[in-house]
């Protein structure tokens, strides 16, 4: 663990993340956040920083899959619930879904259509990375369709060169670390 108490959250993330050249293909410089989440101090600091941005929410919505880890930790910190925004086909019916476009195809996000009342609730969406913005935009649209008031989103890392903020505009996004 290389973070020190009082260290800037971006520095904590940068110091703990692993950089993997040429993954998943040549020329890509992959930023692996797994070591940040596996480090007790790193997880605690990231969770606290996200919780600070999500204060006032009735519910946090963690996006499949690492958003689940972050969302759960943040919900406990804030004393509120967490909703798992799942990849398609993982929840029993009935579900509400939102399909979005990927580079080579499409994907779907889902939430329960009943059993969890979302109408009128103030929700902050939590995910690990903002890249092109497709997943975050779909989560926002899905939760809005379910009647939630999505007040913002928080991501651990933003890949600014991929322009994800434009895809989620006008949703307010807080990023703890940008590259």
Swiss-Prot record:
Pathway: Purine metabolism; AMP biosynthesis via salvage pathway; AMP from adenine: step 1/1. The keyword Cytoplasm applies. The keyword Glycosyltransferase applies. Homodimer. Catalyzes a salvage reaction resulting in the formation of AMP, that is energically less costly than de novo synthesis. Belongs to the purine/pyrimidine phosphoribosyltransferase family. HAMAP family: Aden_phosphoribosyltr (MF_00004). This is Adenine phosphoribosyltransferase. It comes from Mycolicibacterium gilvum (strain PYR-GCK) (Mycobacterium gilvum (strain PYR-GCK)).
